[in-house]
Every structure is written in C-alpha cells, then in structure tokens.
C-alpha cells in the first residue's frame, strides 16, 4: 500500500524548517505529497526547503515531478539523508544536477570523549589517538558543515598545516566533521599544564601565523573577510543605531584589500601540536583578507576576553594569565622590527579593532541570550564607537 508522511521540524537555531518525509512517494500519492509540500511553502514562504528523506523508501517519477515543480516556483531545495537506493534514483535521473542531494550520514558518539576546544560554532572532541571530531551547534545546516569541510580541504591543498577532513557524521541531533590528527594535543592544554614552556612554543605559533598570512587564496575558493564582516554587521544592525552600523562598515571598508588566507578565529585552543609540528583546526571562518582580521580576533580572545571576563576565557580557551603572556609574545614576534613605542601604538590600534568582535557576536554566536548580546554590544558602545573615526583608515601595514 502506498503511503507518504510529511512532518516539519524547526530547530531553535535553524533559519529554515526541516521537512521530514517517510514511506513511499509514487503516482498514487504524489498529489497528496504535493499538497503537503504546498502547505509547508505557505507556512514558510521564505528561504530554502530542506527535505529530510532518511525515512523515505522510494520516490517515483511522479514524486520527482513534484520536486521539479517546486524548483520552477523558484524555491531552493536541499535534500538530505537519502538512502543509497533513493540516492541512486536521483543520480540516474540526473536530479543530483538540479538539487543539492546528500546521502544518509553515519552516526558517531562523543560520550566520554575529551573536549579539546570550544567556540561559537561548536566543540572539538578527541575520539582516539588518531581522530578528532568537530561537533557543530544543534540546528546548524548540513550545507554549512559541508562548506567548512571543503574549506579545510582547500586549505590543506594550499599547504596550510591542518587536519585532514574525511567524513561528515551525525552526533545526536548535530552534525560533525571527522579529522585525522595523529597523536595531537591542543596548544591551550599544553600551555595550561606547562606555562613555563610558553616561550618554547611561541616562535612556532607565530611562524604558523606568518605562513598562513603569506599564502594567497582566491575568491572562487575562499570567502572575503570583508564580506563575512559585512554580513555579520547587517545581522547585528537590529541592535544598533544606524549611525554606528554605517561607521562599522566604513571601518571594515577602510582595511586594505589583500588576497591572503585568514583563519578568522585563531587562538591556542584551535592549534594542535603534533610530532610533525603545529596544525590549525576549526576553519569555519577562514577566508581571504588583510592579516588584521586574524590579529583583531586574537586581540579579542587573548587580551580583551582575558581581562574583561577571565572566568569565560579560562572555560573556553585557558588561563587568562597564559593568554595575556601569549598575546604579548606573539605581538613582539609578529612585528619584530617595530620599536617599543611603535609596538604600543599597534597594540592600541588592534585592541580597538578587536571590539568589532563584540559587534559581530550575535551573528557568530547564534545561541547567545539577549542579555549576553547586550553585554557584548555595550562593550562596543563604550570601547569602539567613541574612537572609531580614529581607527578608520589607520591600517598602513
């Protein structure tokens, strides 16, 4: 007997609903299926339609025509979780060229695994001596996860020391990426346990940063950091005065254009130390742009966070005193030719730019409460907006 069931799941952090389809879709019930999808379209008129076919056993040409009809109505479709049999139907008919279609993803458990890094987009766990996994926040879309995996692969091919990504998996209701990482320990853990060794590691830390910033990327493979920040500022605009939004965008636009690779969230929790040297992980915000985009984020996490919220810094990355010492040594090693006075001027400049991290926090951290968002933005109102005119156009290195 032909039957099809359609239900909608709308996660708290998701911008689009997930429409779960189960059973069979054939000529007998294709019109019923179309009607249920039309109801979903009316209820959620904006954005993509994400169809979860994990529980779908079969789809006939009649069902495919229903999907084609939605496409002709300019609704973007993303089909996830297909069984090998259903995926074969999409592939044989050429529909994989029309829609984003992905196969069912295997599940992995992180129960009992050590957390080695945490951030706004998710947490990184040590699965075994050879494997780590980044688990994304609940509700993050599969397309975003796949994009990060692709970015990591492109960075690896560019010669950037990073873990080899080899599979996208499910962890409960979240997605994750498995990475090969041989006998690795995070730099944050090493410096937390052995603070006296910080000078031993800082040269390699800065060398890795310099290697990244001397590697060119292309817009076809990597997103512009300016575009990322503009999108984030647009998202935060609902919390800000129009004048402050314009000033923030002017500050971003005043940064000299570069085609160099930028990590976007570099701190010792995102650096793994292996027998082969240091490697970067968590490339969710990697793009191309001026190195200041990395240095402002480092100033935000190493200096501003350590001083203004030491308990938070300790929980997310490591001891605040370690972060402050690492920041000081990193700055001196990254700008070896600057005098003491020049270095103080550059640090003051970077600490000002670092308040942009407060402005984009609502976009970067979708799980932040309204109270937390207001706290971040108040920091920007006090420490960025009064000096923003002085910062605009000030990057001359």
Task: Indicate residue ranges for each PLM-predicted region.
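STAS-typified acidic loop motif
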Residues: 2-35, 53-55
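Amphipathic alpha-helical interaction surfaces in cytosolic regulatory modules
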Residues: 27-99
């Amino acid at each position: 007997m032909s039957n099809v069931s359609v239900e909608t799941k709308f996660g708290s952090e998701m911008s689009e609903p997930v429409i779960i389809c189960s059973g069979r879709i054939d000529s007998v019930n294709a019109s019923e299926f179309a009607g249920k999808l039309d109801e979903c379209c009316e209820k959620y008129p904006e954005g993509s339609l994400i169809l979860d076919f994990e529980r779908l056993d079969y789809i006939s040409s009649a069902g495919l025509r229903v999907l084609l009809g939605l496409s002709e109505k300019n609704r973007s479709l993303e089909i996830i979780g297909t069984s090998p049999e259903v995926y074969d139907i999409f592939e044989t008919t050429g529909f994989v060229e029309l829609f984003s279609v992905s196969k069912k993803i295997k599940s992995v458990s992180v129960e009992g695994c050590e957390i080695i890094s945490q951030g706004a987009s998710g947490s990184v766990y040590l699965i075994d001596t050879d494997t780590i996994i980044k688990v994304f926040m609940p509700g993050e879309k599969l397309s975003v996860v796949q994009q990060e995996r692709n970015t990591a692969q492109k960075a690896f091919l560019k010669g950037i020391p990073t873990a080899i990504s080899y599979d996208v998996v499910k962890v409960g209701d979240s997605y994750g990426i498995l990475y090969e990482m041989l006998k690795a320990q995070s730099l944050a853990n090493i410096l937390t346990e052995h603070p006296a060794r910080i000078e031993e590691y800082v040269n390699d830390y800065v060398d890795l940063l310099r290697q990244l910033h001397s590697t060119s990327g292309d817009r076809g493979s990597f997103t512009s950091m300016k575009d990322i920040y503009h999108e984030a500022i647009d998202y935060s605009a609902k919390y800000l005065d129009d004048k402050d939004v314009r000033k923030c965008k002017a500050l971003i636009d005043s940064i000299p254009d570069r085609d160099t690779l930028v990590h976007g969230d570099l701190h010792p929790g995102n650096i793994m130390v292996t027998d082969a040297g240091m490697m970067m992980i968590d490339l969710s915000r990697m793009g191309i742009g001026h190195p200041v985009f990395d240095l402002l984020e480092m100033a935000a996490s190493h200096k501003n966070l350590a001083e203004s919220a030491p308990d938070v810094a300790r929980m997310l990355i490591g001891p605040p005193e370690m972060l402050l010492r690492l920041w000081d040594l990193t700055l001196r090693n990254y700008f070896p030719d600057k005098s003491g006075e020049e270095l103080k001027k550059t640090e003051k400049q970077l600490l000002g730019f670092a308040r942009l991290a407060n402005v984009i926090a609502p976009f970067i951290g979708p799980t932040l409460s309204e109270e937390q968002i207001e706290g971040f933005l108040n920091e920007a109102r006090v420490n960025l907006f009064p000096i923003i005119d002085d910062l605009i156009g000030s990057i001359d290195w």
